[in-house]
Structure formats: structure tokens, C-alpha cells
């Protein structure tokens, strides 16, 4: 089932907001991992990017189990917004800057925080729903916590590198 962004119950809107954010987040994570390949950041970002894609697939599975249609328009707009975000000035004319890295890792961290809240909300409202049998919400919550723990040192280091550097 495909929905067109209008109406819907709160659960449908909530899950569609999260799947749209997860789509943008997966794209951002892939880009951050590619931009940092071969650096101290690269392997962690690659692992987190893989997990974010798995988490998005888990969310789509949850939506299907709960008979919630995916709002393709909302998802496409979020994906497009992530792509447009690449056009933001980052302190240097060409290439990848320390500020780009910081902002990407911060955005990933915020996304992981939102995903953690999503899984907790689903556990508290639908944790015993037989339609979600086989979906390990506790595992998804733990994975979000793990992602947060792995991203935080990268975010701190990226902030030190980007914000201590003086341009001009």
C-alpha cells in the first residue's frame, strides 16, 4: 500500500516520519563512510552505515506487519533534502572539510537518537502485539545505543578538528 502524505492515524504518520528520516540517514551515512574511507573515522562510519540500512529495513518490516503504508512522497522529499544538504558551504570551495565531517557525524548522532526513541516507543506501545512477533525491539534498542556510543567519540574528535581550525 502506498499513501500520499495526507491524513492517516498517528501511528502511520509517526512511522512514515521515521522511515523518511531513516532513508535520508542511510544516504548520509553511506556518504560519510565513503568520504572518510581510509581514515580513523572510516571503519566505524562504514559499520554504522551498514547498521542504519539494516535498521531502516527493520522499520519497513514493522510497518508492513502493522499494515502501515509507506508514504513515498514523504520519503522522496527527505531523500532529496539530504541530497540538497550537500550543497551547503563547508568552509572550503572544493572537497571535504573538517566542518563537513563534524556536521555529518552530528546529523547521524541525532538520527540515531531519534531511532532509539522510535524503538522504545514501539516497545512500550506495541511490544506485545502478536504482529510484531519475531521483531526484537530490545535488540534494535541496544543497537541504537551501540551506534550512539561509537559515534560520540568520533563527533567529539571531529568537533575538535573542525572548530579549533581557523580559516583565512
Where are these regions (language model features)?
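Alpha-helical bundle segments that constitute or directly flank the non-heme di-iron/ferroxidase center
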Residues: 6-37, 103-126
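Preference for long, well-ordered alpha-helical segments
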Residues: 108-168
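Terminal, compositionally biased segments
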Residues: 1-9, 78-86, 93, 149-168
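Alpha-helical transition-metal enzyme core signature, strongest for iron centers
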Residues: 15-29, 45-59, 80-87, 108-115, ...
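Long, hydrophobic, amphipathic alpha-helical segments used as structural scaffolds
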Residues: 33, 60-63, 67, 91, ...
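Inter-helical turn/loop segments and adjacent helix faces that build the functional surface
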Residues: 31-43, 66-67, 122-138
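Carboxylate-rich helix-loop segments that flank metal/cofactor sites and access channels
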Residues: 66-98
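Amphipathic, non-membrane alpha-helical segments in soluble helical-bundle scaffolds
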Residues: 8-19, 42-49, 70-77, 98-112, ...
Amino acid at each position: 500500500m502506498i499513501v500520499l502524505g495526507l491524513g492517516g492515524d498517528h501511528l502511520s504518520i509517526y512511522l512514515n516520519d521515521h522511515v523518511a528520516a531513516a532513508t535520508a540517514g542511510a544516504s548520509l551515512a553511506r556518504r560519510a563512510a565513503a568520504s572518510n574511507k581510509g581514515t580513523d573515522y572510516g571503519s566505524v562510519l562504514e559499520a554504522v552505515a551498514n547498521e542504519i540500512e539494516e535498521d531502516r529495513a527493520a522499520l519497513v518490516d514493522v510497518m508492513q506487519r502493522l499494515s502501515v503504508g509507506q508514504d513515498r512522497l514523504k520519503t522522496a522529499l527527505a531523500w532529496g533534502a539530504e541530497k540538497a544538504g550537500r550543497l551547503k558551504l563547508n568552509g572550503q570551495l572544493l572537497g571535504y572539510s573538517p566542518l563537513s565531517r563534524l556536521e555529518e557525524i552530528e546529523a547521524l548522532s541525532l538520527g540515531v537518537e531519534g531511532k532509539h526513541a522510535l524503538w522504545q516507543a514501539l516497545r512500550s506501545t506495541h511490544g506485545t502485539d502478536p504482529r510484531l512477533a519475531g521483531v526484537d525491539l530490545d535488540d534494535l534498542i541496544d543497537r541504537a545505543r551501540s551506534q550512539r556510543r561509537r559515534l560520540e567519540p568520533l563527533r567529539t574528535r571531529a568537533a575538535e578538528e573542525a572548530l579549533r581550525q581557523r580559516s583565512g
